[in-house]
Regions:
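Contiguous hydrophobic segments
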Residues: 38-46, 162-164
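Flexible loop/turn segments at secondary-structure boundaries
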Residues: 106-108, 139-142
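Aromatic (tryptophan-biased) beta-strands that constitute blades/sheets of beta-rich domains
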Residues: 1-5, 42-80, 129-137, 143-155
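Repeat-blade elements of multi-bladed beta-propeller folds
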Residues: 6-32, 83-110, 117-119, 152-171
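Beta-propeller blade signature
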Residues: 36-41, 115-130
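Short acidic, glycine/serine/threonine-rich loops at helix termini
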Residues: 36-38, 110-111, 146
């Protein structure tokens, strides 16, 4: 079987087993998390929900933009004046959790400082339900918030986990 998202877009995959079956997890350029049966390539039954975009399967997909907490259009994504975000490395699976990093505007000479924060998202590997979100720029009441000036958490986001993630499954 073959699964194609976009030509020349190979960021890698995450892999796990559920009830003895292999599952492949992919983050797409449009910031969707897709779970596929590793043997058949079919969308994983019971994972995610209906994405409000024509042509998507009824199961096997999570719209991660919805979990970032910013207004967006399912067809167009986040308005470019608000920011830009995509997946730049594969998701990782740690125990029962699929963890997804992302990338904001790419390159060393970014055109602006305003952007959507590249928060790290974690999903249940069985259902696709959001388990937690790590705010890369601390919000009020979170550890380290006072070290960010000018309410940076509200308007800047050129902080993200663009490189491949790693984790210690025992801790």
């Amino acid at each position: 079987w073959e699964y194609s998202m976009r030509a020349s877009y190979g960021k890698g995959v995450g892999y796990s087993r559920i009830d003895g079956k292999g599952v492949i997890y992919i983050s797409t350029p449009g910031f969707f998390l897709v779970a596929l049966d590793a043997e058949t390539g079919s969308p994983l039954e019971g994972f995610g929900g209906q994405v409000p975009v024509e042509g998507f399967p009824e199961t096997g997909v999570v719209d991660m933009l919805a979990d970032l907490g910013h207004p967006y259009d399912p067809y167009e994504g986040i308005p470019l004046e608000t920011g830009y975000i995509t997946a730049s490395s594969p998701p990782i699976v740690v125990n029962d959790t699929v963890i997804v990093g992302n990338s904001a505007e790419q390159g060393y000479l970014q055109a602006r400082v305003e952007n959507v924060p590249g928060d790290i998202l974690a999903y249940d590997k069985h259902t696709g339900a959001l388990k937690w979100k790590f705010n890369v720029i601390p919000r009020p009441g979170e550890y380290g918030h006072e070290t960010w000036e000018n309410d940076a958490w509200e308007w800047t986001g050129d902080v993200s986990s663009w490189a491949p993630l790693s984790a210690d499954p025992e801790n």
